[in-house]
Curated annotation (Swiss-Prot):
It comes from Rhizobium etli (strain CIAT 652). GO terms for cellular component: plasma membrane. The chain crosses the membrane at residues 4-24, 33-53. It is found in: Cell membrane. This is UPF0391 membrane protein RHECIAT_CH0003936. Pfam families: DUF1328 (PF07043). It comes from the Bacteria. Belongs to the UPF0391 family. It is a multi-pass membrane protein. Its main location: membrane. InterPro entries: DUF1328 (IPR009760). Keywords: Cell membrane, Membrane, Transmembrane, Transmembrane helix.
Length: 57
C-alpha cells in the first residue's frame, strides 16, 4: 500500500510542476486538478499504510 502512496506522490509532484510552472492555461488547469487529486490519494494511502502497521519506507 505504501508503494501506491509513493506512486501517487510522484504523480502529484510531476503534475504540480507542470501546473504551477506556467506551461499553458488549459494544461495548467488540468495539472492543478490532477495535483490535488493525486495528493489526496497519496495522503489517504499513507494513512492507511500507517494504520495497517506496515513499515514506512
Amino acid at each position: 500500500m505504501l508503494k501506491w502512496a509513493l506512486i501517487f506522490f510522484v504523480i502529484s509532484i510531476i503534475a504540480g510542476f507542470f501546473g504551477f510552472s506556467g506551461v499553458s492555461a488549459a494544461t495548467a488547469t488540468i495539472a492543478r486538478v490532477l495535483f490535488g487529486i493525486a495528493l489526496v490519494i497519496f495522503l489517504i494511502f499513507l494513512v492507511l499504510a500507517l494504520m495497517a502497521g506496515q513499515a514506512v519506507l
